[in-house]
Regions:
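Long, highly charged, low-complexity intrinsically disordered interaction regions
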Residues: 4-6, 13-82
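Extended, charged alpha/beta regions that create polyanion-binding interfaces
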Residues: 1
Length: 82
């Protein structure tokens, strides 16, 4: 499981960040609060906590600015139907 990534922030929108880690671009689904906490695009050495979600038909990577936000995400995912 990928639990964090460190690299250069390529772009940030209110819902998606792209982080370049040694030439590989990772698209991360993020919340508005994480987007607000991230530095401007182009910043190097940015660490983002992550959670990978693997489903039957997709693999998604989500990014978080704090451990608390990631823990809340984990608790929400544990609820059936969410």
């Amino acid at each position: 499981m990928i639990v964090q990534l460190t690299g250069t922030l390529v772009s940030v929108t209110p819902s998606v960040a792209v982080l370049d880690v040694n030439g590989v671009g990772y698209e991360l689904g993020i919340s508005a609060s994480t987007a607000a906490a991230l530095p401007q695009a182009g910043e190097a050495g940015v660490t983002v906590l992550t959670r990978m979600v693997v489903r039957e038909d997709s693999m998604e990577l989500f990014g978080f600015a704090s451990r608390e936000e990631r823990a809340l995400f984990d608790r929400l995912r544990a609820i059936s139907g969410v």
